[in-house]
């Protein structure tokens, strides 16, 4: 987690207007998560546990399913445990059961609105 924080600090300093995709577990380190909240426009791309699992499998990563028969229950617990942290994001967008194009259009509109940019 220390390396994640250092990478985030560096990214914020060097690229103040960049889009930074962080790992979901970043919220487990309060200092790193607070750094993100203080310096960035934050977006929670929320998805159902089923969609999370499908997306991981679609990337060819079957480890979550192979490691445990209770993988879905584990994923639900992880997401529920992080939800209070994720909800601190300025923007929240549910990406479940949405085509990519519609999700992107919604995301673009929400971010431009938050940054007070013309749509």
How would you label these PLM feature ranges?
Residues 2-9, 13, 50, 73, ...:
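Generic detection of well-ordered alpha-helical segments
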Residues 80-119:
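NTP-dependent small-molecule kinase module
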Residues 38-83:
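A glycine- and Lys/Arg-enriched "phosphate-lid" helix/loop adjacent to the NTP-binding pocket
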Residues 1-37, 85:
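ATP-dependent small-molecule kinase phosphotransfer cores
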Residues 17, 40, 90:
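Conserved acidic residues
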Residues 24-26, 48-50, 98:
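Short glycine-rich anion-binding loops that position phosphate/pyrophosphate groups of nucleotides
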Residues 31-34, 54-58, 105-106:
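Short amphipathic alpha-helical segments
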């Amino acid at each position: 987690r220390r390396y994640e924080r250092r990478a985030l600090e560096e990214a914020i300093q060097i690229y103040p207007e960049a889009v930074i995709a962080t790992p979901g577990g970043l919220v487990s380190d309060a200092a790193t998560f607070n750094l993100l909240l203080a310096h960035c426009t934050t977006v929670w791309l929320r998805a159902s546990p089923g969609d999370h699992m499908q997306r991981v499998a679609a990337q060819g990563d079957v480890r979550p399913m192979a490691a445990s028969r209770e993988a879905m229950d584990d994923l639900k617990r992880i997401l529920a445990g992080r939800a209070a942290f994720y909800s601190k994001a300025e923007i929240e967008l549910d990406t479940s059961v949405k085509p990519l194009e519609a999700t992107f259009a919604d995301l673009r509109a929400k971010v431009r609105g938050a940054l007070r940019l013309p749509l």
